[in-house]
């Protein structure tokens, strides 16, 4: 295959398939060009998070948080210290990864250090077969005593999957029940019940949920636990996406994304579920109108 293109006047030239705005030679960046490219990429990743996040619920304008409210935040969920950045599909990465806590620090949030310390003592495994959430026993009386000083509750919930890493329909929970992994597990329910209790008794002024997942979870529980606001943040990426999450919480930017999937109260309510799973019969009746 020729690397040259013949022009109308008969002369030939080497075609330019992509002209980078950072370098004339994308295979040989200078140090300054590489720095400029990386800075632009980080800004793009942050803006992608800001423009893709979806506000699923916002009762009584619970979001955005005021300047006073971001100084008194209690962060719940093991995902707070072990965020979900991207799915298992594909590759890519970044020379630096900004965590959720680092992003909050950069925007002058003050949060409950007792909660963070309790989560960091745990070593939980999270993958497409497991749900990594702390047991309610970590919220000791000494931890609960700190809630009144940090009266804005932000709960982060995550699921992790990707290509060839499908989430299971038969998750074996610690209470011996079996359910889809898109539903809450016992530890998550216990945590949400605890936050709901302190929201009802007036200790917490707001109850915010962040869905840090690329998978479509069941969300009927948002009403069950009295959640004030819920923000879908997806996977913010392996770089600066969590800066965007922090800015969404403060209202410096507005969530402008739209859902491409239906967030149902039960994933089993879809008509397609009647034909889902391992089919052992030789004949199958198709039911989608073929």
Regions found by a protein language model. Name each.
Residues 1-290:
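C-terminal non-catalytic regions of proteins with extracellular/luminal or membrane-system context
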